[in-house]
């Protein structure tokens, strides 16, 4: 587990964030440039469910799945689950690695209409995903006669919290 590695490393109380690096190649081909380096707050890094894996189904982890090591951070976007893991950096500030700033893997800090451009300071790093929902019945465009009662079906989910009710 990631937690075990961090405990073995004797993480200092000043730790705020981790930074994860993989063996990805930068699109420019320049080996001096980092393709992507995501991270998580130290409290999330210490979660029991985060894994550093080297096997899948009793076999060495396939290259396409992140061989030789992959970090798995359940409940957060897949981009945080670093493939081809080469380094974990414990930071005393929010990690500012490649793809942690600007519009990369970020979302508005507050609700906005689609297409609205926001300054970088109004964007936040995507962490756990918000509740999402989908109506599966009736189909889009179905006309329901006024006064007719129907059952609405669908799904609601979230990455780290339980959904216990849905208001329609």
Question: Predicted segment positions?
Answer:
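Structured, non-membrane catalytic/scaffold regions adjacent to prosthetic-group chemistry
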Residues: 1-168
